[in-house]
Amino acid sequence: RSLKTKRKKIMILDEISELNKYVVVHPRFAAAFDYILNTNFDGMPVGKKEIEGKNIIAIIADEDGVPMMESCANFECHNTYIDIQVCFNGVETVGWKSRTTCVEPRGTYDKEKDVLFFEDAPDHFFKLHPGQFGIYFPNDVHAPMIGEGRIRKLIMKVKVY
């Protein structure tokens, strides 16, 4: 007899040059990665654009980084979408913790905005430099945009299923 277990996917961090090795992780990643690798983002205005209807959405963000405490006050995760975040300019620090170890939800899940906040503190912090990306699955509670100076990035929202 075989024992079947359901493994949760966890955050991925890597260089853009390595993006395609993750295409097998999710059926919609091929289309999302194609958009990331074949689009000129220089000068693209801030805002949201549907790539494959509501299944894949691209958001350009260009904002000042925020202090750690401010970002951690919005420690978030999503149920409907996987985030693929690509850093273009600046250095972004991101806080992270597994959702399975979070114990203090703040409010309830907002289905309209696809967000659930936690009062918990991140277990780990890491930096994204230009040319690097992070993939955050529903199990990844994250606090983005920590840093000084301007941070320009792409956030791809990929519908889980």
Predicted feature locations:
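Long, hydrophobic N-terminal alpha-helical segment
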Residues: 11-52
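Conserved metal-binding segment of the jelly-roll/cupin
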Residues: 127-141
